[in-house]
Structure formats: C-alpha cells, structure tokens
Design a protein with these regions (language model features):
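Gram-negative bacterial Sec-dependent N-terminal signal peptides
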Residues: 2-33
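Proteolytic maturation boundary segments
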Residues: 34-71, 253-293, 300, 335, ...
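Histidine-acidic residue clusters that define the catalytic metal-binding segment
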Residues: 43-61, 201-244, 276-281, 309, ...
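M16 family metallopeptidases and their MPP-like homologs
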Residues: 73, 77-96, 100-104, 118-163, ...
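Short, glycine/charge-rich beta-strand/loop segments that flank catalytic centers
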Residues: 138-144, 171-182, 603-610, 636-647
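Non-catalytic, conformational "gating/processing" segments within enzyme and secreted inhibitor domains
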Residues: 177, 230-263, 459, 651, ...
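Short, conserved secondary-structure transition motifs
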Residues: 181-187, 280-294, 398-409, 612-613, ...
Length: 947
C-alpha cells in the first residue's frame, strides 16, 4: 500500500488498477434493476432528505430512503464530472487469515455483473472517453470515474449495478488472482514499501487491523484465492446503499444529477450492516524497534508516534505541526537535516484515519551517514518542539499553507470530490465546514503541548532499513522467445465479442461533450516581448488561483562531453540562491503564502512551473524572475546538491524500473540500447552518472547558464484567475529587463538514429531479492511529433497497449491470462525520433509466457491489421478523454506550452479531436506496417531472474 505524501490526499489508499483510463457507454444495463427486496420509488415515499451545507463549497447532501448518502457539488469550469462511490469498508474490516479480502473484492468489481459480461465495464468507459479506477484503503474502498458530464448517467448506472449484482465468476477470479499476486509482488519490489507496510506498521500495531497490509499477507491472499464464496459473502456484508456514499462534482444540474442517482441506486433495499468489532490498539508502553535487511544501497529511517484519529481535538494541531516540520525547504526537518547534510530527504506528518493512527517521520540518510545518526537528528527536532514554542512566523506560515491548499483543490473536480468522499466515508461529512476555523485556533502553546503529549520514547516505533550487498553471481540467460510469427492468427475474445458488439449497437451514443470543446473554450493570447520571451495567457476565473508552466531551451542535450548532468544541476541550482536572496529566503517567501515555483532539467529543455493564489501572482513572477535572471550558484548549496544527486543515483541501483521513471535500471539500459552516446536521448549508466556528477564544477554550471539561459528561448504560459492584459504587464515588468544576448541561440537539432543492422541481444539486470520482474521491450520508433502520420501512429499504439484493460496487450496478457499487473505500450513522438516501448511487470515464472504472447500480439497486428471498430473505439477514447486533462489550470497550461513547443498553434486544444477523427483506417494500417516491428526490438529484463 502506497503511503500518501501528504495528509490532504485520501487516507492510505491503494491505486489498485494500473491507472486505467477507461471508456464507456451506457447501455446493456436495464433501465431499472430489480433488487431481491426492492423499495417503493424514493420519489413517492417522501423520505428523501436534501440540504445544502458549507455555503462556500456549495455542497448538497441528499439521503435516500435506503440509507444512501449523496454529496453533490456543481463546478462548471469544464464539461466533466467526477463520479465516485465510497464504501465504508477497508482492510480494517478484515479478520486474521482473510487479509487482503477488500482488495481482492475491489478487483472483482470490474469483472462483470449479471448483466455486464467480463470486460464490458472497462469497454463502456473507454469508448466514451472516460477514466475509471478504484482504490482500497484501510478504512474505505473507493470507485470513481472522470467522464464527460453528459455521461454522468452511465457512471451512475454501472456503479449501482455492481453495488448489487457483481457476479464473481470463478474463472474470472482465477485469472484475476494472478494479477493480484503480480501487484503484491510489484509492491514488495520496493524496499521502502517493504519497510513501511510489512515491517513498521505491524510493529506499531499489535492488536488493531492497521497491523496488516491493505493488500493482505501473501499467505492469506493465497488462502482466499480459490474461495469465491468467502469473497461473495464479504461483498454482501459490506456493499449496500446504507454503507456507501456517492460523491459527484462537476458540470451538472444538482437536481437532475440527484434524480439520476435516485433512479438507479434508490431501487435497492438497505442491507443488514455487519456488527464487526474492531479491536482498539492498547496504549504503547515502551519503545519498539524493528530492522529490515535485504539487498539494496540506501538506508532509511521511520519513526512513528501513536496519535488520535481524524477529527479528534488534537488532530488539527497535529496538522499544523506537520506543516511546520515538513512543508517545503523552509520547514524544520529540511533545514535541520537536509541542509546540514544529515539526510538526503526528510519529512513527516499525520494521516487521515477513522481510528487512531501514527504521526510518522520518514528520512533517508546522506552518504556516509548512519541510520542511527539520522535518528538522533530526528529526535533532536522532536525535543526542540517540546522545549521551545514555535515562532509566530512558523505558525502563520503553516496556516497560510493549509488555507492555500483548500483553495488549490478547487481547481480540480477530482480533488474536490476526493476530499468530500474521504471524510464522509469515515463518518465526518461536515469535517471541512469547520476545519479551517479549528486550524486557525491552534496556538504555539497547543503545538508544544501536543508534542509533549505524543512525541515520547515510550510511544514510538522505530524502523531501519539496513541495505545488504547484492550477492555475487552471473546473470542468467534471457528467456527464450519464439520467432514463429507466421503461424499467428487474429485474436478474438469468445467471452465478449458478440455481447460487446450488441452493446455498442444498442448504445450508439453521440460524441461525448468533452470531445468537442471548441465552443466553450476561452481563447488564449500570445505575446512576444521585445527581448524575445514568449508569453501565453488564458483566463479562467472559476477559482482564485493561477498556474504557470514554461521552458527554457537549456536541456540535457546541451551537456558538455563527459559531463552529463550539467543541465540538470544548473536547473536545480537556480532556486538555491540568487544575488539578492538566499535559498532559505526564496523558499520562505513563497511558502509563507502557500505558493511554489519549480525549475527542473529535461532532455530538450529546462522545465518551469509555479502556482499561487491570485493575490500572490506578483510574488510568484518576481521569485521566478529572480531565480532565472540572477542565480548565484553558492558553493555550499552546490555541494549539498551534488551529495543529494549521488544518493539518488544509489537509490536507482535497487529500482528495477520499467514503469516510466527516468534513471532506473531498466530505463537506463533501454536508452543505451536505442541511442548512441552523445545523442540527446541517450542516458549514462549509474556508474557513468556518478563519475560525471563528481567531476562537474561550479564553473561548469555558470558557463552553461550564461550560454543557454536566455529570454528568446524561454516560454511562459499562465492560466487562471488573471486578466490577460494585466498578466502580460506583470510578466514584462518582471522579465523585460532580461537582456537578449547578441549571439544567436544554440542550434536545436535532434539527429536521426540509423536503424540497427541486427537485433541487440537481450540484457538481464539481476536483483535477486525482487519478487517481480520488469520487462521492457522496444526500439527507436522513428516517429517525430512533426510526422504527418503522428495521429495514425498514436491510434495504432493505443489499440496495441495504450490502456491496461481495453488494449490488445491488456486484454490478452492481464485480463484473459492474468500474467501481469502492469501492461502498457507507447510510441513516443518528440522533436526527435522517440522510442516504441512495451512494459510488463510479471512474476518471474510467467515472464516467458508473457513475452511470447506480447510478440504474438504484435505479429498478429502487423499481419492482419486492426478492425474498423477498434479504430473507432480508439478515436472515441483519445478524443473523449483529452479534455479531462484540462480540468485544472496546470493541465491547460501544460497543453498550451506543448502546443507552442511543437508549433501546433494556439487553437490546438480545440482542433485536436478533428485531427484524430480525420485519420482513415488505411492510414492506421499504414502506420502499423511502418512503426510496428516485433522482430527488431531490444529486451531488458530487470529484477528476479526470469524463468
């Protein structure tokens, strides 16, 4: 179970389904489902109660006669709706011997109902351009869809159907259990997960169910795997209207939306709620210590103190304390541990839980610092809280950060709905009404009292990760991969083909409203300042926030020879001190008002980002301008950054990679196989990167900055609650004095890479303690963003593996055969030729079979092509889901910046759907022949040896 990085996220939720962006249509469900014991129409029985609370949030609370609670909030900034159902059941409701049951049940909720065959739920959402997912937490299980607002009824029908009528077919259960095992193994690949979930929490909780992992103990999962009745009985005990909350936020009329929910959910009778006694955790009366030892490179320290549950009087003080300790570079732990070289990273805080949980400190030691020394540093900071009151400035900054977070979350319908649902599902539906008032009432004396009450040695659990050396041994041979593609036949799914065809014919929906956003979109404005800096502004006055994104043509492609990483270090140093402000002053200036600025490296450019409330937009601009125009490159900060970079490289040695994170072992080997040294997309090995990082000097960074940071290669995009003319004036005031050099910019050229004359040999990276194997297959795809067939190629890639559940790879490898939890394929088009790649995360014993199916599916697609139906469904998804990315100011800004970067035009967002819809089947088939080459790719195997 992944621990949230901040307590504002839903409590300890597990991202269970490989973040499926799934499409859907409405049909196959009957107009009304008959429950075994149906209630009379809620509209007729007079027991529907509805009222509006939290005037600032405009939330309407409705109670149906069957006990279902509905929370609805209108938000009309984008034509989308976030629809979710929160069940008040999670791993805390399980019993010993059946742990993991909630998570298995969540997986099976996607495997069909009495009316919907396996695969139909995903199919329906995908073909309607929606995103669907679910998470299992300790206290709740959460199902949610982000979809065009005119598809709200689809979400309600499907969620109501599977609340009552999920089927739990034994064959589907057998397939899905392999996927669950793969997910469990993938989690345990991470030493951090293993330390927190399998070591630290079980030590901290001896009696309460927070003792066990949300995904379950492996032995329990195996015991439940074959027992359909146990899973079904658990479903019937917990999935019922009177144990659920529906939350919907988006572009709808409240009365109509509630009527839709009443129509589909109101027909079900309330269930008999299980009287399940949760054993409370007794007071801890002595320090507990545990140690995890496994192969790895970097240690880790966790310290947890028992604290009260969410909503308890001291909970609000603990939230403030979390900000003081961990929120930003000005926070106490960063200043005391990271700035002083004890820690590579350090943070901590409390989490939202129904029952008393922990205030957790989490730190990673710097090189040559022991876990014990780092623990002493953490303890010193806790003692400081107990002996000295926090300053008025710290207290005010923490409160401003919390207030800003409340404002920022209203940028997104998803975040608004998640916060509402999280608290309603733990029976605190009005939590947000009074939260800010209670936070504002916290005093320095409260902080000191709470620290003295809870942060005591007898109340804490300490966990160390002590990495062990990797055992010596030669890499095993790669798994055999058959090459008999000629015998391949078209793939069909006998369980689904006829039913899904009938479903599509029955529904035959009009194009989702999100697929044609041109009519309602505001028009951005583009201005070029006299110094060449490009400014794009789009107004959105729905929420008093502003998002900024941008870039400077100063990426890693310009790194000097033998000093890879200069560009990244230069970008990172810009926020670590200017000629007018220290790193701490820069951080505190922004953090004191809950704003933020980021500058990071990239392959082709340095990337800029920022966010603030409207009232602080001027501060955001002036800080970014100071960092871009007047960096000081202080020597002490550079050495600190060098040490952190080296520690990060050591961390990468224990990461199998393959999931999209740059710098991990599989991605490094993959990039080295595809691109020659010196190419912008080539990546050094960890050893090479360490040597380069040690060799880079301050003079290298200053020289790079003076050469490549210039206004005429800079783009700034601003979206939010600003007036275009005012924003342009403010940007010109902040950046207009940045002089353009007389010399022209450095050439921006990404060279072509010739196709390999022979297929590279597979590469094996052995991490013996990893329970899962990551497989990365691919080649230089030959596609650029400017390629005329870019859109046809993306349709081809989507059909192959663009979705975990709706693609050919996903359906065959995960859904039908249960061989992998994570399955994906992509064809990247950049300024240069990007990679084609397929990623699989699988158990070592399934690796050879999964690879064989992958090759077979590729060969079948190349030999037989794709169907017109597949092309239509791909278009529906690719056009329908795109505007879902535009629900936030940051999302819109990112798309406008990309359109500028690739010279797509200011109207690209409005035109994008037409560009996809214009692609013909013949163009897709041609793209398959051009870009799909199953026999040419390199194979990277990382993790446990494939069997």
């Amino acid at each position: 179970m992944t621990r949230p990085n901040s307590r504002r996220l839903p409590a300890h939720l597990r991202r269970s389904r490989a973040l499926a962006a799934l499409p859907a249509a409405l049909a196959l469900l009957p107009a009304v489902h008959a429950a075994p014991t149906a209630l009379p129409s809620p509209a007729a029985n007079g027991r529907v109660v509805s009222q509006t609370f939290d005037a600032a949030q405009r939330v309407t609370e409705t109670h149906l006669a069957n006990g279902l609670t509905i929370l609805s909030k209108e938000a009309h900034a984008a034509p989308v709706v976030y629809f979710s159902v929160w069940y008040k059941v999670g791993s805390r409701n399980e019993i010993s011997g059946q742990t993991g049951l909630s998570h298995i049940l969540e997986h099976m909720m996607f495997k069909g109902t009495t009316d919907l065959p396996p695969g139909a739920i995903d199919h329906l959402f995908l073909t309607n351009g929606g995103q669907i997912n679910a998470e299992t937490g300790s206290d709740v299980t959460h199902y949610h869809e982000l979809i065009a607002s005119d598809r709200l009824e689809l979400a309600a029908r499907i969620e109501a159907d599977r609340m009552e009528n999920s089927k739990f077919d034994p064959t589907e259960l057998a397939h899905e259990m392999t996927v669950v095992r793969s997910e469990l193994e993938g989690d345990n690949n991470s030493p951090g997960y293993d330390l927190y979930t399998n070591t630290f929490e079980p030590a901290a909780f001896e009696a309460h169910p927070y003792h066990w992992p949300g995904i379950g103990w492996k032995t329990d999962v195996e015991a439940v795997a074959g027992n359909r009745q146990v899973i079904y009985d658990y479903y019937k005990r917990h999935y019922m209207p009177n144990n659920a909350v529906v939350v919907m936020v988006g572009d709808f009329d409240t009365k109509k939306a509630v009527d839709i929910c009443r129509k589909y959910f109101g027909v079900y009778a309330p269930g008999q709620l299980e009287q399940h006694t949760i054993t409370p955790e007794p007071p801890q009366r002595g320090e507990r210590r545990v140690v995890l030892q496994r192969p790895g490179t970097t240690g880790s320290v966790l310290v947890g103190y028992h604290v009260p549950e969410t909503g308890a009087p001291d909970h609000y003080t603990l939230d403030v304390l979390s900000q003081i300790l961990s929120a930003g570079r000005g926070a106490r732990l960063y200043q005391a541990l990271v700035e002083k070289g004890l820690a590579q990273s350090a943070g901590g805080g409390d989490e939202d839980r129904r029952d008393p949980y922990l205030f957790v400190l989490d730190a990673t030691p710097s090189a040559n610092v022991t876990n014990a020394a780092l623990e002493k540093g953490l303890e010193a900071e806790m003692t400081r809280l107990q002996t000295s009151p926090v300053s008025p400035e710290e207290l005010a900054r923490a409160m401003h950060q919390i207030e800003a977070d409340f404002v920022y979350r209203n940028d997104s319908v998803s975040s608004q709905a998640e916060v509402l649902g999280e608290y309603a599902a733990i029976d605190l539906p009005r939590y947000n009404d009074t939260y800010l008032d209670k936070v504002r009432a916290v005093t320095a004396a409260d902080v000191q009292r709470v620290a003295r009450t809870y942060f005591t040695p007898a109340n804490r659990t300490v966990a160390f990760f002590e990495p062990q050396p990797l055992p010596p041994g030669a890499a095993p041979p790669p798994p055999p991969v058959a090459d008999n593609f000629g015998a391949a036949k078209p793939v069909t799914d006998p369980r689904q083909k006829a039913t899904l065809a009938a479903l599509d014919k029955e529904f035959n929906a009009a194009t989702p409203k999100t697929a044609t956003p041109a009519a309602s979109r505001p028009q951005p404005t583009r201005v070029v300042l006299p110094n060449g800096l490009t400014v794009i502004v789009e107004e959105n006055h729905a929420n008093p926030t502003v998002a900024l994104t941008g870039r400077v043509r100063a990426g890693g492609m310009y790194d000097p020879a033998s000093k890879d990483g200069v560009a990244d270090l230069t970008a990172a140093m810009l926020s670590r001190g200017t000629t007018t402000q220290t790193a701490l002053q820069l951080a505190l200036g922004l953090e004191s008002v809950g704003a933020g600025v980021g500058i990071g490296g990239g392959e082709e450019e340095a990337l800029l980002s920022g966010t603030s409330r409207t009232e602080n937009f001027g501060l955001l601009l002036s800080t970014l301008a100071d960092e871009l125009r007047h960096p000081a490159f202080p020597a002490a900060q550079m050495e600190r950054l060098r040490a952190q970079t080296l520690s990060g490289l050591e961390d990468a040695r224990q990461d199998t990679g393959g999931t999209g994170g740059a710098g991990t072992q599989a991605e490094i080997a993959f990039a080295q196989a595809l691109y020659p040294k010196g190419h912008p997309y080539w990546t050094p090995t960890i050893d090479e990167a360490e040597a380069d990082t040690k060799a880079i000097t301050r003079d290298d960074l200053v020289r790079f900055y003076n050469t490549y940071y210039r206004p005429d290669t800079t783009v700034l995009v601003v979206v939010g609650d600003v007036k275009t003319a005012d924003a342009a004036k403010q940007i010109e005031a902040a950046f207009g004095g940045w002089a353009k050099p007389s010399a022209p910019p450095a050439p921006f050229v990404i060279p072509d890479v010739p196709a390999p004359t022979k297929t590279p040999a597979p590469q094996v990276i052995v991490l013996p303690d990893a329970p899962q194997t990551s497989l990365l297959f691919g080649y230089n795809g030959g596609l650029r963003r400017s390629s005329p067939d870019f859109y046809a190629a993306q349709i081809m890639a989507y059909i192959l593996g663009g979705d975990t559940f709706g693609s050919r790879l996903g359906k065959t490898i995960r859904d039908q055969n249960g061989l992998a939890y994570s399955v994906s394929a992509s064809l990247d088009g950049r300024h240069g030729s990007g990679p084609f790649q397929i990623f699989l995360g699988t158990n070592p014993k399934n690796a050879t079979r999964a690879l064989g199916l992958m090759r077979q599916i590729m060969a079948q697609m190349r030999q037989y092509g794709v169907t017109d139906d597949e092309i239509s469904q791909a278009k529906a998804y690719l056009t329908g889901e795109y505007p879902l990315r535009l629900e936030t100011n940051a999302g819109v800004a990112g798309q406008l910046e990309a359109a500028e970067d690739y010279d797509l035009g200011l109207d690209y967002i409005a035109r994008r759907a037409a560009l996809y819809n214009a692609v013909t089947p013949a163009e897709v088939q041609a793209a398959i022949q051009k870009y799909l080459r199953p026999g040419q790719g390199v194979l990277i195997i990382a993790g446990a040896p494939a069997q």
